A protein has these predicted regions:
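Short glycine-/aliphatic-rich beta-strand segments at the starts of folded cytosolic domains
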Residues: 1-11, 40-43
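Solvent-exposed beta-strand sheet faces enriched in polar/charged residues
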Residues: 6, 36, 45, 77-79
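Non-catalytic surface loops within mature trypsin-like serine protease
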Residues: 9-11, 48, 80
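Short amphipathic alpha-helix segments
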Residues: 12-30
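Short, conserved charged micro-motifs
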Residues: 12-16, 49-56
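Generic leucine side-chain signal with a strong bias for well-ordered alpha-helical environments
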Residues: 14, 25, 46, 65-66
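N-terminal glycine-rich anion-binding loops that anchor highly charged ligand groups
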Residues: 31-37
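C-terminal structural segments of small proteins and small subunits
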Residues: 55-81
Length: 81
């Protein structure tokens, strides 16, 4: 079983990387982007048999290490293969 985990800043948290990229795009003449946020996408291969077990592993991983609960939110998609 595989999963994709998406981690982004919470609403209202400053994203300096996103701000830098947004300004760089404007400086090279690309217009029309009002808000840009840079996040992380983590792909994992899970050694489990059920979707419930996969959810438990992902939730523990995100809450204990992968995402900072003070500044980030996460969501995920489980892909059965």
């Amino acid at each position: 079983m595989k999963a994709k985990i998406y981690i982004n800043y919470k609403e209202g948290i400053l994203d300096p990387e996103g701000l830098t990229v947004s300004k760089a795009l404007q400086s090279i003449g690309i217009k029309g982007i009002n808000n840009l946020s840079i996040g992380k996408c983590i792909e994992v291969e899970l050694n489990c048999k059920t979707k419930e077990e996969a959810i438990e592993i992902i939730e523990k991983s995100c809450s204990k290490l992968l995402a900072n609960p003070n500044t980030e939110v996460y969501n995920y998609k489980i892909i059965k293969e």
